[in-house]
Regions:
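Positively charged, low-complexity intrinsically disordered leader regions
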Residues: 1-4
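Active-site-proximal beta-alpha core segment in soluble small-molecule metabolic enzymes
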Residues: 7-180, 192-193
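Short, solvent-exposed loop/turn elements at beta->coil junctions and helix N-caps
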Residues: 183-185
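Active-site loop ensemble at the mouth of alpha/beta enzyme cores that anchors a bound cofactor
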Residues: 187-197
Length: 197
């Protein structure tokens, strides 16, 4: 059902954190992988490793914080780490291990990421040695609501996010996989130009 609503070129990234919300992380991920899903998101390093041990291929994005001391495990298990803020990015880079990351951009939730308006820190994150930025993302935290105030706020988040992505491209940086929508956003705001939903 979700696939039928995706814009051309958009893939599903299945969020299977917390044992797929109680349904069994590995079982759910294997079923989705057989159905063609090639990207997954988890809450923490242990969940990512568990999926790899269960035979899950493709991208596995860790949405939560991973201690920089555990960077070798990110590399060993071919996991992609969210950069929680610029200090986290600096600390990961300082470990001297090549780590694939997605950069979280804070477009208003104020829980995770570099402020989308802070272009100096965003550029620094892209320039950090040992970090391979494979994507940028944010979270539309009221996209499940159709209240006028929430719709307006979601639109502000989208504008800020896509303006930042466009600025990165103009500055000569490839943002990689771009993702901001959840399934709620997909229903309420179809056809956004995303690589993942």
């Amino acid at each position: 059902v979700l696939r039928n609503t995706l814009a051309p070129g958009t893939e599903l990234m299945a969020v299977v954190k917390a044992e797929a919300y109680g349904h069994g992380g590995a079982v759910t991920a294997r079923t989705l992988q057989r159905a063609g899903v090639r990207a997954f998101a988890v809450a923490c390093l242990a969940e990512g490793i568990a999926l790899r041990k269960a035979g899950i291929r493709g991208t596995i994005l860790i949405l939560g914080y991973t201690s920089p001391e555990e960077a070798p495990l990110l590399t060993r298990w071919h996991l992609t780490q969210t950069v929680a803020d610029i200090d986290h990015g600096r600390a990961l880079a300082a470990r001297g291990r090549r780590v694939h990351v997605h950069l979280a951009l804070d477009t208003g939730m104020h829980r995770l990421g570099i402020l989308a308006e802070n272009r100096k820190e965003i550029l620094e994150a892209f320039r950090l040695p040992n970090l391979v930025v494979d994507g940028v993302f944010s979270h539309l935290y009221v996209s499940d609501s159709l209240e006028a105030e929430d719709v307006a706020y979601t639109q502000e988040q989208l504008t800020l996010f896509y303006d930042t992505v466009a600025w990165l491209r103009t500055a000569g940086y490839d943002p990689g996989k771009v993702h901001i929508q959840s399934s709620y956003g997909l229903w309420n705001l179809p056809a956004q130009p995303c690589d993942y939903v």
